[in-house]
C-alpha cells in the first residue's frame, strides 16, 4: 500500500492482520487491544522536534469493554491502555517509514497521569512527537506523547521507545 498521511479504522484493522505493511512486518494489535479508531495525520516532518508526528483518535462509548471490568461501579479507562496506544503509534510510524520487522515496546522515561477517561467522554486524542528515528540494523523510535480527552490533556509520556525486530525469538 502506498504511504498515506491518514488512516481509517479499516486501514488500522488491516495493520492488525499484517495486510497493511506485509507479512512479517510490524502489526498493530487486533480487536479490543487496537486503541485508536483513526490516524488523522502522520508525517515524517514537523512536530515539536521537526522529526515527525502523529495525531490519532479513539471514539469513546459507554459500551467499550474496559468500562465493564475497570472498575465495577466506578468505570474508568485503564491508564495503561493510553500508554499502550502511544507505543502502538510509535511502532506504526516505524513501519510506515519502511522499517522491517515486528514492533516491540522498549520502555518509557516518564509517564504522568493528571486526569481520567470516563464513559461520558466523547473522544480521546493521541499526539506523538518524534525526537529521534534510527534506521539502521535496528529501527527504533524515540518520542514524547500525550493523551487528551475531549480537548483536555490528561496523560503525558516522555521518551517512548519502540523497536522493530526481524527476529524476536531471543527477545
UniProtKB/Swiss-Prot annotation:
Keyword flag Lipid metabolism: yes
EC number, as in UniProt: 4.2.1.59, 5.3.3.14
Catalysed reactions, semicolon-separated: a (3R)-hydroxyacyl-[ACP] = a (2E)-enoyl-[ACP] + H2O; (3R)-hydroxydecanoyl-[ACP] = (2E)-decenoyl-[ACP] + H2O; (2E)-decenoyl-[ACP] = (3Z)-decenoyl-[ACP]
InterPro entries associated with the record: FabA, FabA_FabZ, HotDog_dom_sf
Location in the cell: Cytoplasm
Superkingdom field: Bacteria
A GO term for molecular function: trans-2-decenoyl-acyl-carrier-protein isomerase activity
GO biological process: unsaturated fatty acid biosynthetic process
Main location: cytoplasm
Active site, UniProt feature: 70
Pathway this chain belongs to: Lipid metabolism; fatty acid biosynthesis
Keyword Lipid metabolism: yes
Family from the record: Belongs to the thioester dehydratase family. FabA subfamily.
Assembly behavior: Homodimer.
Function text: Necessary for the introduction of cis unsaturation into fatty acids. Catalyzes the dehydration of (3R)-3-hydroxydecanoyl-ACP to E-(2)-decenoyl-ACP and then its isomerization to Z-(3)-decenoyl-ACP. Can catalyze the dehydratase reaction for beta-hydroxyacyl-ACPs with saturated chain lengths up to 16:0, being most active on intermediate chain length.
The protein's name in its UniProt record: 3-hydroxydecanoyl-[acyl-carrier-protein] dehydratase
Amino acid at each position: 500500500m502506498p504511504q498515506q498521511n491518514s488512516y481509517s479504522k479499516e486501514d488500522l484493522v488491516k495493520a492488525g492482520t499484517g495486510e497493511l505493511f506485509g507479512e512479517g512486518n510490524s502489526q498493530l494489535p487486533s480487536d479490543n487491544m487496537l486503541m485508536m479508531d483513526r490516524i488523522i495525520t502522520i508525517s515524517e516532518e514537523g512536530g515539536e522536534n521537526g522529526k515527525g508526528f502523529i495525531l490519532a483518535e479513539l471514539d469513546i462509548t459507554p459500551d467499550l469493554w474496559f468500562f465493564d471490568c475497570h472498575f465495577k461501579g466506578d468505570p474508568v479507562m485503564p491508564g495503561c491502555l493510553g500508554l499502550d496506544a502511544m507505543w502502538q503509534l510509535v511502532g506504526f510510524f516505524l513501519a510506515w517509514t519502511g522499517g522491517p520487522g515486528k514492533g516491540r515496546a522498549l520502555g518509557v522515561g516518564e509517564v504522568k497521569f493528571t486526569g481520567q477517561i470516563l464513559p461520558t467522554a466523547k473522544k480521546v486524542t493521541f499526539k506523538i512527537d518524534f525526537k529521534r528515528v534510527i534506521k539502521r540494523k535496528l529501527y527504533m523510535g524515540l518520542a514524547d506523547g500525550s493523551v487528551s480527552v475531549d480537548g483536555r490533556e490528561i496523560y503525558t509520556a516522555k521518551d517512548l521507545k519502540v523497536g522493530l525486530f526481524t527476529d524476536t525469538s531471543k527477545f
